[in-house]
């Protein structure tokens, strides 16, 4: 500011010293005197606008100014990703003040746990000849490649630049350039189904529910993704963006044409893990009455083709109805007590799919044709003829699939025990040994464009084999589906082990921590970080001799650590401070989550929580790392346990202990824990603070839900951090201190559940027999 003023003063001093040769316009010049021509001769000082210094600004026309402000459009690709079609960014000085700001935005848009896990750090030209180091080097209409710290990978990135919007277009840049008119006509024909239509979208959650009316026509419905964006802006879900739309019959909307069918009312759900309750698809009498009056008023303009450019018009009615309202649903769920949604868990909602998939739904798996999903229908619960046809030796289109034939020969396939967004789980029994497993069937057509996420998860499962980790027994593949034979754990999760037992001591908690630390030491030895350690992913395995152990599952967010990671993901209650701070993190984020779990095991509530259910408050507490052991809940807990928790919950990553140090700590290894029964106290607090700690009717469903999840279900858990959270951007919603409803798998019941009898689950291969000191009902401590 001071330099600017000094320049202005120097300018005026120069004007005083050197008068302009000409006087005011229309005044005659004087040959001999300077009294009339000089600026001071007539006592007038010319305006700065007339000075030579300001003549520069007069030459900059409005056209020049507008061209300077105009945004440059450029397309960005991921380094080495030949299946990514690129993302177009509008780059302007107003949007990006610096080159680092552009890198940060590209990281949020292009980075995930497989591609660019360390964020975007380098931008190459499309041919890799040079690096881009400033915003001025980016040119209008050019393409660039984003990388972390790795060298440029030479791939023909522009090969798949034109997406196949129509199933009749075979794609390819060459054909698009050769016959643009034909492609354009085909695209136009594919949208002939679009007619002006007024639809009602109801937000999921507790009643009364907000509803909005949206006009769909050729001006407002360009693509399915664009309509979802408009619905997100209109309905404003508490949990962020709208990820899923269903009709009142429970059928999922998968493409743009589904909006123009017989259905007029849709249910909108966000990225939270949510299983639909039966009454979510049923409108009460007041909602039907309000909707009827609303539609009677709007029927005259329903097909008039409004000229308003806006995509939606809000309705003050709480809900809407569909054709008089006959809706049936067989879905059941446990809904979070806060706003009716399990907000903290950020997985894609679990919905039961319709038995017939939409014929207009686009889908391909690396060029393979899509076929209808098998085994989804409720009439085929035993996996009979349909599964046999799916796994028949003839395969698909007459091609033999020896893998599927081998699968049927080796295993007896039973009924469906779990149905998720991208996978279905069936009972599976080894014909030779009689051991029970879970068969996870992933539909490749539903993973189109995101196959790398599934491949990453499966590649990690192939590598790990440990008694405290749910094991991938076998994998097989056909042209349309991926089959994973998984270890089936029937004992429920960590909370079930506490709430369903008659006695729970500090020693039991110590054994649970030992099991978890044992699994983490193994994973970290392979440089694998789990990133989603929480009680819902820790399943209880009960052995024939009555002993128990924990098994870690759900590797959807797991990845191999080759350097600092920057993807902000996880579950708020268990997320480490370095993830929130976005300073880069590694293996020890799992240790922090284990420390939070250890704290909960001994008192029943988390160490960091927001009394006002605000995510910002929770993150501030985690970043501060102020750990307290309030009385009277911690009065009877040993100092050794408190010491270990303090070492695990160190904000300083270097000071935080490792998994090996946890195993060697006296509280874990030397039986420094007490035998006092604290089952009633801990169970009471768990039921108060965690909705998934309520007793379940069937503990097997907990293990099935963990197996049913895929890496694609985890996309919603990559969230906006504390630094980028605002009211207009979807972020991670918090239910504090209630963590995620990992378990909205079973509806809560009021009657207390009896302690389950030990299950005759088979002992996994390689599991050592229980030592003599491990009596029935105690926890096993597997020694590596």
From Swiss-Prot:
InterPro entries documented for this protein: Doublecortin_dom, Doublecortin_dom_sf, Kinase-like_dom_sf, Prot_kinase_dom, Protein_kinase_ATP_BS, Ser/Thr_kinase_AS
Species per Swiss-Prot/TrEMBL record: Ailuropoda melanoleuca (Giant panda)
Full protein name: Serine/threonine-protein kinase DCLK2
Pfam families per UniProt: DCX, Pkinase
Keywords per UniProt: ATP-binding, Cytoplasm, Cytoskeleton, Kinase, Nucleotide-binding, Phosphoprotein, Repeat, Serine/threonine-protein kinase, Transferase
Composition bias, Basic and acidic residues: 7-19
Positions carrying Phosphoserine: 379, 664
Annotated gene: DCLK2
Annotated positions of the Phosphothreonine modification: 61, 683
Single GO cellular component term: cytoplasm
């Amino acid at each position: 500011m001071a330099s600017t003023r000094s320049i202005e003063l120097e300018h005026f001093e120069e004007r005083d010293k050197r008068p302009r040769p000409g006087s005011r316009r229309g005044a005659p010049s004087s040959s001999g005197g300077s009294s009339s021509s000089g600026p001071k001769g007539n006592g007038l000082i010319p305006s700065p606008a007339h000075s030579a210094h300001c003549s520069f600004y007069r030459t900059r026309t409005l056209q020049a100014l507008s061209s300077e402000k105009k945004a440059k459009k450029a397309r960005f690709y991921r380094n080495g990703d030949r299946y990514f079609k690129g993302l177009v960014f509008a780059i302007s000085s107003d949007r990006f003040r610096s080159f680092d700001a552009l890198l940060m935005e590209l990281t949020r848009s292009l980075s995930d746990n497989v591609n660019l896990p360390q964020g975007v750090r380098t931008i190459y030209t499309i041919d890799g000849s040079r690096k881009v180091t400033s915003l001025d080097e980016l040119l209008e209409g050019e393409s660039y490649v984003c990388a972390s710290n790795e060298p440029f990978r030479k791939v023909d990135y522009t090969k798949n630049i034109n997406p196949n919007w129509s199933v009749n277009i075979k794609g390819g840049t060459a054909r698009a350039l050769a016959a643009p008119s034909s492609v354009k006509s085909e695209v136009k024909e594919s949208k002939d189904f679009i007619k002006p239509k007024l639809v009602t979208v109801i937000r999921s959650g507790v009643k009364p529910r907000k509803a909005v009316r949206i006009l769909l026509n050729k001006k407002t419905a360009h693509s399915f993704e664009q309509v979802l964006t408009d619905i997100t802006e209109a309905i404003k879900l508490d949990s962020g963006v709208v990820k899923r739309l269903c009709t009142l019959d429970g059928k999922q909307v998968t493409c743009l044409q589904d909006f123009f069918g017989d259905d007029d009312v849709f249910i909108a759900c966000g990225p939270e893990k949510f299983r639909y309750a039966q009454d979510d698809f049923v409108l009460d009498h007041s909602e039907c009455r309000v909707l009827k009056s609303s539609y009677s008023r709007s029927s005259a303009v329903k097909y008039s083709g409004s000229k308003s450019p806006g995509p939606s018009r809000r309705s003050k009615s709480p809900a809407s109805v569909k054709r008089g309202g006959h809706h049936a649903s067989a879905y059941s769920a446990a809904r979070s007590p806060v706003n009716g949604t399990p907000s903290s868990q950020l997985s894609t909602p679990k919905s039961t799919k319709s038995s017939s998939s939409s014929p207009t739904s686009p889908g391909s798996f690396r060029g393979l044709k899509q076929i209808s999903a098998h085994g989804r229908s409720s009439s085929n619960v035993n996996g009979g003829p349909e599964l046999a046809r799916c796994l028949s030796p003839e395969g698909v289109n007459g091609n033999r699939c020896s893998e599927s034939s081998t699968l049927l020969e080796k295993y007896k396939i039973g009924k469906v025990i779990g149905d998720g967004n991208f996978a279905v789980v069936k009972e599976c029994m080894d014909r030779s040994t009689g051991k029970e497993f879970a068969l996870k069937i992933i539909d490749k057509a539903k993973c189109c464009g995101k196959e790398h996420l599934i491949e990453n998860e499966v590649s990690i499962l192939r590598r790990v084999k440990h008694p405290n980790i749910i094991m991938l027994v076998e994998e097989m593949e056909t042209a349309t589906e991926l089959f994973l034979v998984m270890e089936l754990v029937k004992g429920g999760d960590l909370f079930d082990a506490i709430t369903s037992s008659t006695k729970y001591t500090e020693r039991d908690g110590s054994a649970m921590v030992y099991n978890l630390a044992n699994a983490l030491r193994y994973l970290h030895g392979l440089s694998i970080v789990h990133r989603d350690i929480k009680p819902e992913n820790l399943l209880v395995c009960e052995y024939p001799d009555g002993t128990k152990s924990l098994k870690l599952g759900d590797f959807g967010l797991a990845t191999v650590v080759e350097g600092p990671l920057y993807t902000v993901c996880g579950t708020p209650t268990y997320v480490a401070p370095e993830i929130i701070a976005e300073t880069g993190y590694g293996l020890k984020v799992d240790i922090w989550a284990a420390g939070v779990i250890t704290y909960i095991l001994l008192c029943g509530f988390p160490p960091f929580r927001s009394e006002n259910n605000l995510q910002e408050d929770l993150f501030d507490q985690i970043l501060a790392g102020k750990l307290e052991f309030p009385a009277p809940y911690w009065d009877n807990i040993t100092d050794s346990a408190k010491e270990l928790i303090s070492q695990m919950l160190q904000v300083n990553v270097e000071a935080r202990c490792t998994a090996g140090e946890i195993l060697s700590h006296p509280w874990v290894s030397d039986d420094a824990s007490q035998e006092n029964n604290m089952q009633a106290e801990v169970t009471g607090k768990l039921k108060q603070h965690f909705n998934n700690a309520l007793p379940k009717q069937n503990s097997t469903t907990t293990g099935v839900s963990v197996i049913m999840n895929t890496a694609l279900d985890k996309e919603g858990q990559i969230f906006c951090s504390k630094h980028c959270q605002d009211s207009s951007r979807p972020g991670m919603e918090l239910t504090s201190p209630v963590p995620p409803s990992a378990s909205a798998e079973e509806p809560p019941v009021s009657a207390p559940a009896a302690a389950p009898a030990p299950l005759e689950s088979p002992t996994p291969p390689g599991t050592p027999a229980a030592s003599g000191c491990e009596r029935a009902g105690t926890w096993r401590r597997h020694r590596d």
